Amino acid sequence: MALLEICCYSMECALTAQRNGADRIELCAAPKEGGLTPSLGVLRSVREHITIPVHPIIRPRGGDFYYTDGEFAAMLEDIRLVRELGFPGLVTGVLTVDGDVDMSRMEKIMAAAGPLAVTFHRAFDMCANPFNALKNLADAGVARVLTSGQKADAAQGLSIIMELIAQGDAPTIMAGAGVRANNLQNFLDAGVREVHSSAGVLLPSPMRYRNQGLSMSADIQADEYSRYRVEGAAVAEMKGIIVRHQAK
């Protein structure tokens, strides 16, 4: 049966995902940045209360995936922490300035991760040649690759995702970016074995007083009065589609 991974940005979201049938959680902070390394407090809380597998993302900042030496050192330290806390896997990715997988740094990441399953995240979609990148990641021992097929969303990139799946069984190709209940069946019919979804909605802030002329974000258009939340019904609906597909 296909595996359903839900992207969660809080303890609350992780509990919702677990209750509604998620098979695994990618744990992140900062949804507006596309996901950054969670805080130690969140990591410890999730480790204590969530029983399904949780893979924290290791990403020190938003933007591109070429990191300074200092940023990369922090990533390795975060990986060691995630390993010490007992998580079964992690999510990360590093590129060279030419858009290739940085194999030298991936070797260090794999060594730091040890027995943890490593997912290479959508830095893969920023690679110059996805097929060369996949081969290199297979050689590195990466467990899976999260990809939208190098398109804005996975529905547009499905043909490339299918080509990547055809390259072999390892790493597992996990389709993500815009995967929802209304298009999930297309991925299952294409032979995708793992799917990744935010299954999220924006929850309005309960704040009554609002200073509408001020933003805490560098993006002055950012909505200060909403936050991301996993929608339990969306997770349950997707899990139901997967179960019914398996029963065919």
UniProtKB/Swiss-Prot annotation:
Chief site of localization: cytoplasm
| Superkingdom of the organism of origin | Bacteria
Q: Where in the cell is it found?
A: Cytoplasm
Q: Which GO terms describe its cellular component?
A: cytoplasm
Q: Does the keyword Oxidoreductase apply?
A: no
UniProtKB keywords: Cytoplasm
Molecular function terms, GO-annotated: copper ion binding
Q: How does it assemble?
A: Homodimer.
The UniProt entry's sequence similarity note says: Belongs to the CutC family.
Q: What is this protein called?
A: PF03932 family protein CutC
Say which species the protein is native to. Salmonella enteritidis PT4 (strain P125109)
